[in-house]
Amino acid sequence: MAWMFLNGDGMRGGRAHHTIEGVPLVGERRTAARYRFYSVRDEFPALYPAAGGPGEAILGELYDVPMKQLRDLLDTEPPELELGLIELDDGDFSFAMILRDTEHETGGHRDISAYGGWRAYRASTPPPDGAPSDDAPSGSA
């Protein structure tokens, strides 16, 4: 079993929650205030370490995931993300999907850190034209 921090549509009520269904929820948690949070094409969120600048604490859900299910979950993630280790606000560490360095270097993603989480961002912005609705399947955790 491994802790996995979800901060996108894999959370309860999200369109990709089925990928984690049945896995024990540890609880709602926040990252340490050391991360920037990005919207990738307004389709899914991405955490990235805030090196050399201010960071925010990002809200998500922590799950205790069996290793086989974690492997299966990784297969559903977008190519812009990779598995990384993050720090939580209480000093514990967890796996999470983070933005790849090469993606961050492009500078083409919207910084949504001030919203503090994906749900808050989605609630405040209409989906872009052609974007999937909240009940459409998506692989983003």
Regions found by a protein language model. Give the residues of each.
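Glycine-aromatic micro-motifs
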Residues: 1-130, 134-137, 141
